[in-house]
């Protein structure tokens, strides 16, 4: 982003950290998942590492987000994904001033919540 005073550069990790904190507040999202590609293992990330479950690409001030999530057992996946997309889109666009071009959601696991 540029204006008459200079340029503002936002690192992808800043966007992923913010998007992760927004995502875990959404209904049905238990947390973000770290996928070990070599072993095919999925593990639930602790709050300090949420950004590891999100891939961010910024091109021409447009953001693409890939979420790897773990959802609650018994929820409607489509409803959870729709809520996640709309909530993250609104909050990240407000936070960064950039447009969200695409949000991809990968459901990596299901957890039973007590």
Language model segments and positions:
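Contiguous, often N-terminal, cationic amphipathic patches that form binding interfaces
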Residues: 1-73, 82, 94, 99-114
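Solvent-exposed, non-transmembrane alpha-helical starts
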Residues: 77-79
């Amino acid at each position: 982003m540029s204006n008459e005073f200079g340029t503002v550069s936002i690192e992808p990790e800043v966007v992923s950290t913010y998007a992760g904190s927004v995502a875990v507040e959404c209904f049905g999202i238990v947390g973000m998942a770290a996928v070990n590609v070599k072993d095919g293992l999925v593990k639930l990330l602790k709050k300090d590492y949420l950004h590891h479950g999100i891939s961010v690409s910024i091109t021409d001030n447009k953001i693409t987000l890939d979420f790897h999530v773990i959802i609650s057992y018994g929820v409607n996946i489509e409803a959870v994904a729709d809520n996640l997309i709309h909530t993250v889109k609104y909050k990240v666009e407000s936070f960064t001033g950039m447009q969200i071009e695409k949000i991809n959601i990968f459901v990596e696991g299901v957890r039973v919540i007590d």
